[in-house]
Amino acid sequence: MNKGKFYIRQAAFSLLLLSFLNAESQTAASTKYPQGYFGNPLRIPMSLSANFGELRPNHWHMGLDLRTDQKENYPVVASADGYVSHIGIRPSSFGKFIIVNHPNGYSTLYAHLNRFYPELEKYVREKQKEKESWAIELDFSEDDFKVKKGKEIGKSGNTGGSQGPHLHFEIRDTETGRSLNPLLFGMPVHDNVPPVLIKLAMYDRSISTYAQTPKLFALKKAAGGYIIPKMPVLKTGFNILSFAIRAVDKFPGTQNSNGIYTARIFQDEERIAEFVLDEITYSESEFINAQIDYRFYKAGRGYLQHISPLPAARGKIYHVSNDDGLIRLADTFPHKITIQVGDANDNFSTINFLLQFQDGIDISRPVRSSDKNFIPGYVNIFEKTDFEAYLPEACIYDTIQPIYSRSDATLPNAVSALHQLKDNSYPVHEEMTIKIKPTVQIKQEWRDKIVIQRNAGNALLKPVWQGEWLSAKTGAFGSFVALVDVTPPQINNPGKGDTVDLSPASRIVFTPTDNSGIKSFRAELDGSWLMFTNDKGRSWIYNFDEQCPYGVHHLKVRVADLVGNITEKTWWFKRYPYTPPKKKIYNKKKASKKPVKKKK
């Protein structure tokens, strides 16, 4: 591994070098995929609330979100013939989902389901009981659960990380697992509306993108395309530069703003760089933080998408015609710049303007030249008396100037100083290792009760001891302090009394709390495992079923936290048929009408 001082590691670009096919549109990628093979996975017309490649925190959206009229339990059907190859139940993610393999080498995924079709639901329930786990992943062979195109495979829902009823639908390459843009397969979605261009951003690429605030230009739609108002010639003091775009895609008949598919930039008619969101793997998805201006986004200013790649943007969405995809101005003549932004249906919007170098304007504040700068593509090591950080080669996307501070921790259970290394407005790709040396002697019985808190409770890391140091992996810069946690979790009571009366209830809900976070939850009813769901994160829920018949029962709940503190509580409860009391209806007496005296 190398440890170096150079701003750009040339090898970092080797994964980006792809030649352009000048005579063909990149959006003609749809010809690579079978057209009309996959049908609508719903029995209502397809309407998109989100498309492939949409920008999300730390990932691109990997499929289509299909509206279900803001309702649950619509039939979800197989998009083509095949067999169920995998099911999963993932809290705060896909929820209940199905993967179907098809004979043409592709797979489809259907997520946020309320339930599977009856035969599959019954089988999964048996496996959950066998494994004593609600969250589960199961693989199947070709002969287990075959499906036909249009066969109902489940009901739509709002499970997992879903924020409202809808169906998440993906098409994948079965062999590689790459998620593919479903709109390239001729899905029945009408679209003749080009993207809307909002803002253009310009960067000085002689320095790190993290060391500057981009120059912003509002865009205006005009005859023949978009323009930068009142600026026929854009003059700049940058002779090596790049652009980013804020743009959204639109579909007919909806006001939704969706993600764009591609953006490309030309200098004097030569294509310099582009990105295309046609295929992405989940392992590549976090590279979105290299495609956007991450610091601009973290400041709450929205998304800007880089048209040219950052030095260590190793994802495969970029294509460049030179070593780095950057604009170079070697003279003071005006140069024609064209930017095209398109969707997956070949609807394009275009910006044309002249770009001219003029010395002495747009002066950037350079990054201080230092051997201590964090350089992408190299191992970077940061060392202080009681704090260290180790950044692997694939940790960062552009040069970062480290800023560090140390202060006394104020939390009563702190066992180290508070260490601040940059802040979380700088993205981290591959996790870095941080090490902290405690400032106090740790009791032997407390050594396994230590957590490292990042950013005032935003995340808790479980460290391991390395001699006198605590070591942990982290996916973000920020503040770090070591804390001791000897307080066990707290568990709420399901009701009052020695024998809780749950006859009026339809379910039992526990929402345990803890200083370091809940690691495990287990419930037993009359000595047997009882399945609680944990779909949305904090609460564990059991809906009464055949496992809990009417009568008196014994319930035991055991909760463990991140460092191994355990709380166990038991209750007796009773449950009998219950009829809610009838509401009393009060009849209002009609006011008597007094006779009206006639005037004499």
Regions of interest found by a model, annotated:
Residues 364-365, 372-377, 404-451, 496-498:
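Proteolytic processing hotspots in large secreted/extracellular or virion-associated proteins
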Residues 244-248, 435-439, 507-513:
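Short edge beta-strand/loop segments characteristic of extracellular beta-sandwich folds
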Residues 192-198, 486-490, 581:
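Proline-centered linker/hinge motifs at extracellular inter-domain junctions
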Residues 118, 148, 190, 203-208, ...:
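Long, low-complexity serine/threonine/glycine- and acidic-rich segments characteristic of extracellular
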Residues 228-235, 423-425, 494-501:
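Short beta-strand segments of immunoglobulin-like
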